[in-house]
């Protein structure tokens, strides 16, 4: 009988449950007043001190009981709030894991995505209905065990894959921890002894209302108000107790949102063409910019049937080689590196890439060299013979520094002692005095640059001089620029040179995929600007009308021509 009654109570909406509690106490109050009021008039007739004693005891008791009610409401609210936070953490970790699968090679990428979608379906369709019946199912554990086996069987082959894999495992553990908190809440409730205290205390309060000697109408009004207050407070406690079962319960909404925003399109578009966009280091600019571009492209998947997957890579040189080898369909590349590959110059003299094609231009990238405060290095000529980090082999910065060093005409003994550290390791090495300077080719403002400047009060090095002027004059893909000091709390701008970040592909790339990139980014440019500070000043003219390092892909050219953007 008790189980049926609780099941009926749990089936009520919050409004219905509130009405039941308030109505119960209100009716009890009225019945008691109707029965007791005539007798109390005879008892206290001519004995005012009896009524005074009742009021005094009721006031003190009521204060203590009100404190108990308040504490119980706060406690149950905190339990519900904590559970909401755990569910949000589970959803956030799930979303990050799903996006991070882009960094994994096929077929592991598709297998992980399918397993994560299956887990999400199970949580929404199986776990939560079971929670409402105070049951915990084992299916979620089985699915997580399968995902764990997939993750631990993977061996990263690049530094970017290693970093993403480490983050993937961290978020996987965070999701498991949040899930365990959710499961423990299935059986979380207020102890029965406290419920007995609440109900007995409420009934004693009602009895005190019956014993007051007032005129009938004021006593009914006062008793009704007090009864409704008791009903509301106990309703709140009851509704938030068992936070996965009752009226004010925690639902799977955050996880449902992850499915709708991140996964649903893949269930509804199983035949969508998936293309990979090579980006850069996770701590750099290319990776978040690549995620932003893919997010824009994937919004129109129902229209063009193309899914974009952003992959972390060492950078420009790696992206070009991967496009050539067919491992990537698209890549974000420095225009100077792309130009050298297309023309067969510099590092590409023995391996030209005449099939390389441009898709769209992005933002200017400036050569940014940082040194510790107090360093004697002020200009690029001062770097001769110094220890300089120029980024990982395969990055655009590495290739750009080779071009600059050649233009400077240094002898062998004057050339820099280069290192190939990633952004975080380079920052630590600079602050520790293990290197003299750190070079980046990056769009501004940059979080990596900001972190380095604040880590050990670093300064910028000017990239200027006759040799640099001659280099810019001979290279159409380079231009003079300056790093705005105001972006980093500095008083002066620093002269430098720059290039552009460009999305590149191969001449043989699927025209539908190229057109999807071009159409989506142009149509959503206002949204794209909000995705990363480096994209904030992006214009259609710069994206389509600039000097490309290689000819436009025919599909991109056709899109821009149809939009009237090509002159």
Where are these regions (language model features)?
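Bilobed "Venus flytrap"/periplasmic-binding protein-like clamshell domains
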Residues: 272-300, 306, 365-432, 526, ...
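Segments of small-molecule ligand-sensing domains
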Residues: 488, 493-567
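A structural signal for short loop-to-beta-strand junctions that line the ligand-binding cleft
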Residues: 350-362, 367, 486-494
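N-terminal (or domain-start) structured segment
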Residues: 270-334, 340, 349
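Transmembrane signal-anchor/signal-peptide helices with a preference for the extracytoplasmic
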Residues: 67-88, 241
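Structured inter-helical modules in multipass membrane proteins
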Residues: 96-187
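Alpha-helical transmembrane anchor segments
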Residues: 7-41, 184-268
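Pocket-lining segment of extracytoplasmic ligand-binding domains
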Residues: 335-337, 345-347, 375, 412-512
